[in-house]
Design a protein with these regions (language model features):
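Sec-dependent N-terminal signal peptides
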Residues: 1-15
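Repetitive, compositionally biased segments used for assembly/scaffolding
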Residues: 18-109
């Protein structure tokens, strides 16, 4: 029984969820993000979900948490594209989310 509880506790830690927190200072961030104007300019198309259980792996479904310690990734929104690690575009529908440039996928693991 003890081992089952340990395994059940560790399984959520190994999933690649996309709970993000928008940080105030760039030096505290894991990833610097720039929001582009057009979909064809982005590396990742992001859909903001309403609940944390709606995130599904590294597929561009982001849930913005209220506290830094709840997040999987801390992101900082930059003012210029050349300052960013990742360029994103917010989409209107869940099925539109996903990676356009898979070479940047490692940034969100």
């Amino acid at each position: 029984m003890k081992y089952i509880l340990i395994i059940l506790f560790l399984i959520p830690l190994t999933s690649y969820s996309q709970k993000v927190f928008s940080i105030k200072y760039s030096n505290q961030s894991d990833v610097k993000v720039y929001v582009v104007e057009y979909e064809n300019q982005c590396d990742l198309k992001v859909f903001k979900v309403d609940y944390p259980n709606q995130v599904d792996g590294n597929k561009g479904l982001w849930y913005f948490v209220d506290y830094q310690n709840q997040s999987d990734k801390k992101i900082y929104f930059v003012d210029y594209p050349n300052q960013s690690d990742l360029k994103i575009f917010f989409v209107k529908y869940k099925n539109q989310s996903g990676w356009r440039d898979k070479s940047k996928q490692h940034l969100m693991y």
